Structures are given as C-alpha cells and as structure tokens.
Amino acid sequence: MATAYAPPMASQVMKSGLACSKPRGMSGASLTRRPRFVVKAVKSDKPTYQVVQPINGDPFIGSLETPVTSSPLVAWYLSNLPAYRTAVSPLLRGIEVGLAHGYLLVGPFALTGPLRNTPVHGQAGTLGAIGLVSILSVCLTMYGVASFNEGEPSTAPVLTLTGRKKEADKLQTAEGWSQFTGGFFFGGVSGAVWAYFLLYVLDLPYFFK
C-alpha cells in the first residue's frame, strides 16, 4: 500500500538552510580565530614610590608636586624672580624686568637687522629694541585693562599652600599693573640706551657689536 508523500513547506526549508549555513573559508574551517596567548600581571617584590603626587597630598588643590617643583633650589630661584617678589613694589619690579629686556634686545637687532652691514647698525638695533619694548608695553596695558577693574582688591591668594597667611600681591590690581607697565617701559628704554652706550659710545672691546 503506497504511502502519501507531503512536500516540506517553504518555511521549514528556509529554517533548515539557515541552521546549516556556516561561514567557511578555503579549507572549510570557521573564520573565527581564538587568541593563543595570555597576558598576566606580575606583582613586583620591590616597593614602588610615587614620584609625581598632589601638593600636600590634596588632589583638590589642582597642582602637582614633582621633584622639580618641590626642589628647594627651584623654589629659591622662582622666589627671587621679580614677578614673585611681593615685598617689592610693582613699579620697581617693572623697571627690573624692563631693564633686562631692553639691554638684551639691542644685540640681536643690531646683528640680524636689515641694516646690519651699514655703519648705523648700532643705532638701528637700539631703535628696534625700543620699538619692541613699546609694543610689549602696549600689550601689557591691554592685558591690565581686560583683567583688572579699577578699585577692586587684589585677586592673588592670601594663603600659601602650607596655610601660612601672606599679604596680597599688589601687582594683581589695576593700579599695581599700571605701575608695573610704566616701570617696564621706562626700564626697557633705559636698558636699550645703556647697551648702546656701552657698545658704541664707550667702544668697549666686545666680540659681538
């Protein structure tokens, strides 16, 4: 007696095809690869020391203590710079910074300027140094006008990182910054004139002039 044959439905054929389909390469193997190496973290027996850490162990200060910044030699050098000598008036600090800039700018302008091969290269270098000092003075004035308001107290902190009280820096005020800018301009012009006097009036035996 013959049995009836029922053809499979299309959905069953599709499911069986999807179940049997696997990605195969040239050799018929699966394309997925498993890593054959294992990374292990080995704990060192020697104790490690943190070289860079927050100042005073407080991460909320927002500054880091490194072997350079915490060195007594670096602290001594920075404390002797004019910008950090709070006991000196802003006018005198500006004069000191300006003298250094004006004195050192004459040489590069005289030796590398467009008139370096002419008899007036010294005068041209001096005028170039004075011009740059004037431009820097204008920039300092613009910074002071944009950063400080007339009559407001100093924005400098009155506490050190160790908690010691100190007097607020007068440089961080509109009046103090104005004095610093005026001192910088006067010191820069004086330094340039003094360098010209030593190089080309007294005619000292400098190697470069």
From Swiss-Prot:
Residues 41-124, 203-209 are stromal. The modification N-acetylalanine is found at residue 41. Keywords: Acetylation, Chloroplast, Membrane, Photosynthesis, Photosystem I, Plastid, Thylakoid, Transit peptide, Transmembrane, Transmembrane helix. The keyword Membrane applies. This is Photosystem I reaction center subunit XI, chloroplastic. Pfam families: PsaL. InterPro entries: PSI_PsaL, PSI_PsaL_sf, PSI_suXI. GO terms for biological process: photosynthesis.
